[in-house]
Amino acid sequence: HQFIPFTQSAGGQNTGAVLVNGDIGGDLVINGSWSVSGYHSIGRPSSVTNLDADDLQQGGSAVAIHASVGGGVTIEGMGVEDDVDDDGDGITESAGDTNDDLSATILTYGSAPTIAIETDGVNNIVIGTTSSGYGLHVQGTLAASGVYDNVDATAIRIAGSGASTVSIADGITLDRLVSAGASNGSAYGVVIGPNASTSVLLQRGVLAANVTSDNAEEAVSVLINAGGNMPTLTNSGTIRSQLFGEIGAATGIRDQSGTLTTINNTGAIIALLIPTDADPADSIPAPPATGPAVAIDVSANTTGVTINQTADVVFNDEDTVDDDVNARPTIQIYGDILLGSGADTINLLKGDIIGDVSFGAGADSLTINNAARFAGGITDSDGALTINV
């Protein structure tokens, strides 16, 4: 059992906070406040003309894992809701556990992922199961910020290299806040890279990617690269990708691997392009933002994808009181949906889908029931679409 509770700020080129280069037989548990940057300043100035290369050095990841962890990885925190024993130490708040709600806050400023689970190109990485039942369980806050122009930001990246692989047992669960933001660069929330695999992404908190740019950049909350593998995504929280500016792309979920076959949504999946006005004091309106706003892009899939949007269920955790009910988002998919050449199915049984749906080829099906609403266009390349209302 490796428990890391510290408060730490690290600075300098390639500097990190937690580095795992050797196998851990038990679990890795991280709490406290962590901040990593290679920059001279993490405050974005109005002008960078006085900054030289030493002021803009790139730091490393706050948490870099390059070896196996038998008992999984937990970023501690309150999680989805305030329970009687959030830290799982057997002592409840009513019994005097003053640290029960202590949540990790892990921040990176620069291009390095906040959490990187990546191989060295030689050895495989296996992340086992935590006591909560997941391989990677984020109950606290993770944030990545590029800060300066042309610096991409990534909150979580899991990837193999060469012939070596990364396997996350029993999925990834996000229970609080994971975010990435960039200026004139791209932002990525969770990236499942080549040679990386996990069974499910269970998103119960807020997962966000935000970009401010007048260049052709992108904000993507969930990205599965070609060569990655993740068959299921279940969202009961909010997945939000936003691009502020004139041109670019906002994508909630993009699968380039063709392995994502089931998406369950009882929360919100949102992709937005938001025009910005450089001079709000004048009478000239901001130019419209142009580019794709895609909630779900599984167009690389050839075997068929099922998207289920259904009613919310009471959060099943340690207590009998559903304390987070007031924080639940309105059930919706806002943005376009791009499907592939397989037999795809959309079951819209609660809430709204607002956006155009491209079914592609295959024997596809769209079912709308229970007063759910669809607003948008529908295209199907081969005419083999069945609609049930």
Where are these regions (language model features)?
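Surface-exposed loop/turn motifs in large extracellular/passenger domains
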Residues: 1-354, 358-375, 379-389
